[in-house]
């Protein structure tokens, strides 16, 4: 099962989240410091390795890749995403055959005096050996340094993205999206309007989530447990596991594997907590019975709800009810998210479910009490479905019209790069605004916020 391609306009998932969030789940930001920087690959440079998108045909097999993130961070978390067939690992399940070459054997070097990524003095900050997974993060010391460089041995495969985050303050905004083929095909779609991380950043500008995609087609909870040591080895250094799991356990509509599923999920939860990882579990995605011939047994949904309640976990997205109401976002098999908005909806639903954590974290950092944090989370986490404005591009000018102005308060329209940099922010007094300064070719998001309403539109400048 491979990645889907989606080229869409704006979409906003509406709803109300009323989760009581306390400071126990407070998130410490880790600033993205590599977004949009040129990646030096010998005699050439490229920007698609740092543009925030996993475009399949824009990959690199260079054996040396260097980035200058500048001085300042004392520690860096360096994430990378490889293509493969979009599965996180190739041999964790017997149900599907997966292929792809992971970035397996390489060193990460750092320099304080390089000028172009090749000259200067370099030190080994990390050595990675026999890595089998397509997405991973490594923490390195970076005090006094300005450059880091991947130096690979052997086949590099297809490298899609490199991200570096400043971990000087002990950032905990780190995420691993464990899942089945639904996440493999949805969360790792080669192009969607915006990722969960981008949506969170657009709404909470102090945060730039470090996001690893871990979907594997055909995997079930029993196979996850069988490979928990590998999950913890290669994705155990993040703070949050965003888990989509259960479709293959519940396949066919019966409940014959329910007991095993509950036992396995509890094992996953316990193992994550033992490593100080907070698991957040999505409700299993509904099928389209007219095409699949079956539906998720309600007993599995009740089991997910009970696991969340009994373990006092933050609530994950309700994939079941959303896709039950939107079967048009499922593919021809009636099970998997399609390329015409299915993966896009998954990103939005995850962002909506996680918003209370960020709202509570913002409130706690501003000095509010625990009660205030909960109240703020309930208030900020309301997403009202609104029509996206009309966006047009003429050369390097972006016009935004048909903006729904707030009856009270300020309507804020922001132009944000795909990797989270705010280019310009305008307080709109009419339903039309224009962005014309510092606009280069690339992918952008137009974000409108007002009176609890929120929309995101994607735009490309050629």
Set out the residue ranges of the language-model regions.
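Active-site segments of SGNH/GDSL-like serine hydrolases
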Residues: 244-248, 268-301
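Trp- and acidic/polar-enriched beta-sheet ligand-binding modules for extracellular glycan
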Residues: 35, 59, 87-168
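C-terminal outer-membrane/trafficking sorting elements
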Residues: 380-462
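Oxyanion-hole/transition-state-stabilizing segment in secreted/luminal serine hydrolases
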Residues: 187, 196-197, 222-262, 271, ...
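Disordered, acidic Ser/Thr/Pro-rich linker "stalks" and the adjacent N-terminal cap
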Residues: 26-72, 81-91, 97-102, 112-117, ...
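Catalytic His-Asp segment of secreted/periplasmic serine-dependent ester chemistry enzymes
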Residues: 188, 250, 287-368, 372
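Serine-esterase "nucleophile elbow" of acetyl-processing enzymes
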Residues: 141-214, 229-237
């Amino acid at each position: 099962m491979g990645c889907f391609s989606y080229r869409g306009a704006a979409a906003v998932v509406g709803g109300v989240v009323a989760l009581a969030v306390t400071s126990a789940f407070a998130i410490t930001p880790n600033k993205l410091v590599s977004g949009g920087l040129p990646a030096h690959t010998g005699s050439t440079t490229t920007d698609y390795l740092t543009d925030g998108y996993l475009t399949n045909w824009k990959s690199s097999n260079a054996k040396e890749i260097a980035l200058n993130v500048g001085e300042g961070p004392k520690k860096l978390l360096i994430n990378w995403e490889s293509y493969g067939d979009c599965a996180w690992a190739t041999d964790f399940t017997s149900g599907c055959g997966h292929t792809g070459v992971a970035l397996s054997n390489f060193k990460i070097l750092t320099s304080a005096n390089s000028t172009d990524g090749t000259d200067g003095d370099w030190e080994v900050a990390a050595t990675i050996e026999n890595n089998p997974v397509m997405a991973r993060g490594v923490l390195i010391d970076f005090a006094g340094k300005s450059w880091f460089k991947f130096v690979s041995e052997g086949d590099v495969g297809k490298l899609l993205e490199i991200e570096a985050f400043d971990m000087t303050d002990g950032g905990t905004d780190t995420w691993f999206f464990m899942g089945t083929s639904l996440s493999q095909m949805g969360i790792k779609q080669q192009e969607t309007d915006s990722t969960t991380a981008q949506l969170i950043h657009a709404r909470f500008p102090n945060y730039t989530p470090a996001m690893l995609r871990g979907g594997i087609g055909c995997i079930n909870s029993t196979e996850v447990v069988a490979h928990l040591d590998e999950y913890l080895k290669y994705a155990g250094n993040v703070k949050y596991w965003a888990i989509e799991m259960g479709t293959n356990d519940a396949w066919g509509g019966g409940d014959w594997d329910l007991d095993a599923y509950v036992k396995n999920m509890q094992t996953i939860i316990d193992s994550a907590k033992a490593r100080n990882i907070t698991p957040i579990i999505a409700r299993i995605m509904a099928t389209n019975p007219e095409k699949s011939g079956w539906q998720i047994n309600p007993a599995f949904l009740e089991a997910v709800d009970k696991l969340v309640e009994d373990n006092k976990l933050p609530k994950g997205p309700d994939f079941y009810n959303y896709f039950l109401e939107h079967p048009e976002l499922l593919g021809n098999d009636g099970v998997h998210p399609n390329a015409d908005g299915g993966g896009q909806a998954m990103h939005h639903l995850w962002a909506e479910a996680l918003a209370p954590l960020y709202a509570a974290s913002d409130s706690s950092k501003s000095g509010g009490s625990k009660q205030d944090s909960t109240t703020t989370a309930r208030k900020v986490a309301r997403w009202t479905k609104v029509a996206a404005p009309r966006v047009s591009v003429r050369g390097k000018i972006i016009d935004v019209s048909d903006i729904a102005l707030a009856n009270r308060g300020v309507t804020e329209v922001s132009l944000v790069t795909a990797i989270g940099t705010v280019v310009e922010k305008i307080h709109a007094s009419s339903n039309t605004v224009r962005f014309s300064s510092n606009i280069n070719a690339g992918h952008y998001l137009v974000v409108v916020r007002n009176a609890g309403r929120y929309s995101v539109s994607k735009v490309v400048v050629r």
